[in-house]
Amino acid sequence: MKLMNRRTFALALSLGAASLLIPSFAMAEDHLAEAISHTKEAIDHGKQGHAKVLVTHAEAALKHANAAEKASDNEHTKEGITHLKEAIETGEKGHAEEATKHAEAALGHL
């Protein structure tokens, strides 16, 4: 009887822990999807020479990438964040072509 109670307790504990972790993984995926979407928009505008609009989308992508990285620590996301920051910095200087390259590199990591 004790063995059954221990198993039941262990199962309940495992299910409880899983239910706490699953929402954070789902939120990380949502933020990552938003980061990817904004990064693609940044790239499209960068290819058209619109550095200011690229920066706007890269900043939105960065916000979501940071939230995704907080929810689920990932080296690829961190690298994507680094490139998004470079895209923003370069885009603010009006260099759309170079900023686009950084945004494309970020997309490859997100």
Q: Where is each model-derived feature located?
A:
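Bacterial N-terminal signal peptides
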Residues: 12-21
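Long, charged/polar, soluble alpha-helical segments
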Residues: 2-6, 21-110
